[in-house]
Amino acid sequence: MTARAFWLLCLIVGSSPEAPVAERKTSPPHSRKPDSRGCPSAEETPGPRAQPLLEAPQRPRAAEVAPAARAWPDPRRRKPPPPADNQASFREAARAPAGPPGPRLAQAENRASPRREPASEDAPRRARSRALRFPAARPPALATEGSAGHAHPNRPRAAALAPGPAPAPPPRFSLSFGLSPPQRDAEPGAEPCARACRSDLDEREAFCESEFAVNGIVHDVDVLGAGIRLVTLLVDRDGLYKMNRLYLTPDGFFFRVHMLALDSSSCNKPCPEFKPGSRYIVMGHIYHKRRQLPTALLQVLRGRLRPGDGLLRSSSSYVKRFNRKREGQIQGAIHTQCI
């Protein structure tokens, strides 16, 4: 009884589920070894044998799946495609031989790509665009060759230039960083006007022939009519070169001097010219009652011109911008005797 229980225990231990089933099934009979515990195997055990336990159905492993089942892989476990090579040489080598262009290739022809044409046939893109933009800046031979060559795929073909005289060069920039003013035709009466307004007398002659000589800043200019202006100068003590009976009105540090400027010329530019805020050297005559003025002029003035005010005529007066050179010549004329 004891031996039979011992053999039954060995049989139960040998057929327990902890042992690998595949190993028990696949191992051949000649490779089986006796149990290390000294228990003989089930085949060698005499007497009744125990029935093998029923095993639960197991899922087939991924390695044991038939090759036919791999035709429909799981899309979620699909392997990502291999990364594309960025080298142009490998892509070009893997391309298929050239055939008739498809619709997508014909549509892609409208894109500008530097690989469409070899670099040896045409100049670089910048030189080609500059040549198309300014055809007059290059020689005629190059202009004709560039216009007849293959046009850029993204630009319309330039029209052929009509044979004729070369177009005018682009305007040049002067040193003042601006465009040079256009040369306009001189007006027919511009030269006589400039000649009539320019005084032929120098500072010394004008000083001797005038009745007053001052330099001052133009305060205001009142235009009463065509060729009739009332000018107010602010003169300091150093600017009174020659006074005689010139009427002065004190105004703080300066003296106010009123003058009537008459322009007998029919020019667009007033003569003499006075700009408010500018400093001028003025030499002319003094108005008094003995000097008769036209009745129409007196009606326009309406008492604004008083005796002692200056009287400037375009032909017998001296009006020029102030500078140190002219002032020095007038200072020298003060100490000389007029003939």
Curated annotation (Swiss-Prot):
Belongs to the UPF0450 family. Gene3D superfamilies: 2.40.50.120. Residues 56-72, 132-163 have a biased composition (Low complexity). Keywords: Disulfide bond, Signal. This is UPF0450 protein C17orf58. Residues 193-338 form the NTR domain. Residues 1-17 form the signal peptide. Residues 17-191 are annotated as: Disordered. InterPro entries: Netrin_domain, TIMP-like_OB-fold. The keyword Signal applies. One of its GO terms (cellular component) is collagen-containing extracellular matrix. Residues 21-36, 112-125 have a biased composition (Basic and acidic residues). The keyword Disulfide bond applies.
